[in-house]
Design a protein with these regions (language model features):
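The feature marks proteins involved in alpha-glucan
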Residues: 2-43
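Active-site machinery of serine-nucleophile hydrolases
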Residues: 76-147
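Short beta-strand element of the alpha/beta-hydrolase
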Residues: 55, 63-76
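Primarily recognizes the serine-hydrolase "nucleophile elbow" in alpha/beta-hydrolase
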Residues: 162-209, 215-216
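Gly/Ser-rich "nucleophile elbow"/oxyanion-hole loop immediately N-terminal to the catalytic nucleophile
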Residues: 60, 126-171
Length: 285
């Protein structure tokens, strides 16, 4: 569409059938914004935790549009290198801005709680690992996402609504958590992104559960990746094995499953930053 017969809309073309349809173009914005909500108390966690929220390019310009929610873990590492644990951020906002303005994705809100300094291992793992004597609070953390954080997002931002399913993504233990969430709560999560997931946790328990369990949701989209350098080749043998298990269970590559190998990539933020656009292009197409 054209604005005042002069300015073309950004993003993708709108393909419709004859009839009346609602479309939500935007014309001037070229970048989204990240808002930070710091030192907020969350009763489900009994803790104060910062949350970063990315608002896509069209958010301020088109006030009628509503957006799906993508939960991402380790929010401190996603946007601002100055806040990142190791000084390197994924630049999630830049990746999403580019894809949105090129018309490559459905715009979404990214809601990214910061991880706990001392509780991350417990909150991101579904079972207790006897070797580490830690873990097993993933269900409590997912309850926080779904029953406290999600209602807060719906109340404060324009989303598709409380009843709609959400997406989830993360790296390392956050990738393990994302797979677990989508596999065990298909009514709440419709897709997941697992960057270098820690499939080794608790004797590969989650991967064994996926291999022997029933398919929870045939329309579940899964993005799965790893590098191939560093200790354990960044878990590449296990991620490839999980890819094969999913394909045996009827997932199809480039349909509802995307597998990416980052050649020369190690288990670090810089590598996930290089691959994140591939995940967004697949999950939010």
């Amino acid at each position: 569409p054209l604005l005042n017969d002069a300015v073309w809309a950004r993003g993708d073309n709108f393909v419709t059938r004859p009839g009346v349809h609602d479309i939500y173009p935007f014309f001037h914005s070229i970048g989204g914004t990240v808002t930070y909500h710091r030192d907020r108390y969350w009763s489900h966690l009994d803790d104060r935790r910062a949350v970063a929220v990315y608002l896509p390019p069209s958010y301020e310009e088109n006030r009628a549009k509503r957006y799906p929610i993508l939960f991402m873990q380790d929010g401190q590492n996603l946007f601002d290198p100055g806040q990142a644990t190791f000084g390197v951020a994924w630049r999630v906002d830049a990746a999403l801005d580019h894809l949105a303005c090129e018309g490559g994705i459905t715009e979404a809100l990214v809601v990214a709680p910061y991880s706990s300094d001392d509780g991350r291992m417990d909150e991101y793992t579904p079972t207790r690992d006897p070797g580490r004597r830690r873990g097993g609070r993933a269900d409590a953390y997912l309850d926080f996402l779904l029953h406290e954080l999600k209602p807060w997002v719906v109340d404060n931002f324009r989303t598709t609504g409380l009843a709609e399913r959400v997406a989830i993504a993360g790296s390392s233990l956050g990738g393990l958590l994302s797979l677990y969430a989508a596999w065990t709560r298909p009514r709440e999560f419709w897709c997941c992104g697992a960057f270098s997931p820690s499939l080794w946790w608790d004797g590969q328990r989650l991967m064994r559960d996926i291999e022997t369990g029933r398919i929870p949701n045939e329309d579940l989209k899964i993005y799965l990746d790893s590098g191939d350098r560093g200790p354990g080749a960044d878990g590449m043998p296990l991620t490839r094995r999980l890819r094969d298990i999913l394909m045996e269970k009827s997932w199809e590559l480039d349909s509802n499953l995307c597998y990416v190998l980052g050649e020369g990539h190690e288990h670090r933020e810089a590598a996930w930053a290089e691959r994140v656009h591939r995940a967004f292009a697949f999950l939010l197409e």
